Amino acid sequence: LKNSSLLPHVNAGTLTKEEINKLKPVTASMGMMLENTSRRLTKKGMPHYACPDKVPIQRIRTMDNMGILRIPFTTGILVGIGETWQERIETLQAIQNSHLKFGHIQEVIVQNFVPKQDIKMKFYPKPKHNDFLKTIALARLILSPDISIQAPPNLSLEHPEYLKVGLNDWGGISPITKDFINPENKWPIIKDLNNASKLMGYSLKERLTVYPKFQNEKDGFLHQHIRTKMELLSCDNGLAKEQYIQ
């Protein structure tokens, strides 16, 4: 905050209220993938077995605490790890229920599972493209209109089709750094992504890590340290003052 123009976004997994409060003065927004609310997926032989940080009730509690403490929040669902359609629906409903109570969720990421060589599920198949499109559409139908729907454009060459079924945000795409979660999948070139979006009737606009609706001083979503910095970086409409694509 002192030495750069960056606005920190923290993704630290499950956090207590005390930890969230400690981070708020130096954090613009926070995030944590809910992934799935199914207890079945935590049983032996399933993807979340022996992962105490991924016990659904712990993640739901963190998500709710973010709302109680007025944190602009990002969460999401992981698609293709052995979950059923009913479990996908219940996960999206849990996110919606939290947002209805606290109004703090900025965006929901619909992320497709990608097998990696160093994990136990390395031979597990990727989710089918049509199933993934249906899940994005499902998210758009279940979640409030003020929640953005996001999906990573670097995990599928068919990503422009996401715009047909409800996606309205591509997430963070860097021309400088790699995707540290999926380093084997390069970010698309931003101008190419803009051209692909234009073919679908859209154009890219650069935003800050805090969406415009959460920048209202009266709502208490931002600490004054963050607000002061954000005012230097945002336009009157709340988007980034400097746009990568003019």
Feature-to-residue mapping (PLM):
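Core AdoMet radical
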Residues: L1-M66, P72-T75, V79-I81, H99-Q111, ...
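Auxiliary Fe-S-binding modules of radical SAM enzymes
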Residues: N3-S4, I89-Q246
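Short Asp/Glu-rich motifs
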Residues: E19-I20, L41-K43, T84-Q86, I181-P183, ...
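Conserved phosphate-coordination/catalytic loops
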Residues: D53, I57, Q86, K126, ...
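Short histidine/acidic/glycine/proline-rich micro-motifs that form metal-
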Residues: V79-G82, K178-F180
